[in-house]
A protein has these predicted regions:
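Exposed, low-structure sequence patches enriched in small/polar residues
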Residues: 1-274
Length: 274
């Protein structure tokens, strides 16, 4: 699109997509390898509250330039191997962020972000191993801080308690990322801001769970933060700078649709178990 008039005059957005499939598996003709690529570029006027803001705690009147963003990413999907590979590169000029005082700032120079992610799921009889790994780099950590590596693993055993009536999952969900300057949060502003006071991460966060699918009802029990920072000597489980995540706790819930939902009532779902 292109904006011809108004406050957002000269704003535009261009997107292009390309994809194709190949069929290398003779025995699995309906399971191709898919290649997809996307290119996007846009020019956008900053939001009103990035330019002007008045409150008891914050006040600013800015004259920020338009934000230019260019993105190039691609995906390789191999369903037969339960494997997905994603890679992307983003270039942002005039990026707007919030500094250590939670004041809106604009970085005039271009900042680039590169990322590669891998999703691979394994299944051995009733054992499921769902894994995701992400590697990413920011050219300017003061403006766009990122953990270099982030990992999520969901391992569980799925089995029938009563065939076609009740199914159960028992397992754990683990998240981990390397040390980084996790953003702080300003309740008065309602925004996250960059901070250089303390690094967080390098500590696994583990939830144990049990999911039960009984006909249409899904019941879950979750033991939150079962590891309490294990195996690290010092626990480090913060969702933001100064905001600690829950310590050990139990959660119990039920999801019970009172009408049929195609694709939702056939097997155990993820309604809270990870």
């Amino acid at each position: 699109y292109y904006t011809f008039l108004g406050k957002e005059i000269n704003d535009f957005s261009i997107d292009a997509n390309m994809g194709f499939n190949i069929y290398p598996f003779r025995r699995y003709r309906k399971s191709p390898i898919s290649f997809n690529a996307h290119f996007g570029t846009n020019l956008k006027e900053p939001d009103y509250y990035q330019q002007h803001y008045y409150s008891n705690h914050y006040k600013w009147d800015n004259d920020f330039s338009k934000i230019s963003t260019t993105t190039l990413d691609g995906t390789i999907s191999i369903p037969h191997w339960k494997l997905n590979i994603d890679a992307g590169w983003t270039l942002i000029k005039n990026h707007i962020y919030y500094d250590g005082q939670a004041m809106a700032q604009q970085e005039a120079s271009a900042v680039s972000v590169f990322n590669v992610s891998l999703t691979k799921n394994f299944k051995l009889w009733g054992l499921h191993f769902d894994n995701q790994a992400l590697f990413q780099l920011s050219s300017n950590e003061d403006v766009i801080p990122l953990p270099m590596v982030a990992i999520n693993a969901r391992w569980y055993w799925q089995f029938n308690v009563v065939k076609k009536v009740m199914q159960m999952q028992i397992g754990a969900n683990v998240t981990y990322n390397t040390n980084w300057y996790a953003p702080g949060y300003s309740p008065a502003l309602g925004m996250f801001y960059n901070q250089k006071v303390e690094k967080y991460g390098n500590c696994p966060y583990i939830d144990a769970f049990v999911n039960i699918q009984w006909k249409r009802a899904c019941i879950f029990v979750k033991f939150v933060n079962v590891g309490m920072g294990w195996p690290m000597e010092h626990a480090d489980y913060f969702s933001a700078h100064g905001y600690i995540r829950p310590q050990r706790a139990f959660k119990l819930g039920i999801f019970w649709p009172f009408y049929m939902q195609p694709g939702r009532n056939k097997s155990v779902g993820n309604a809270g178990g990870g």
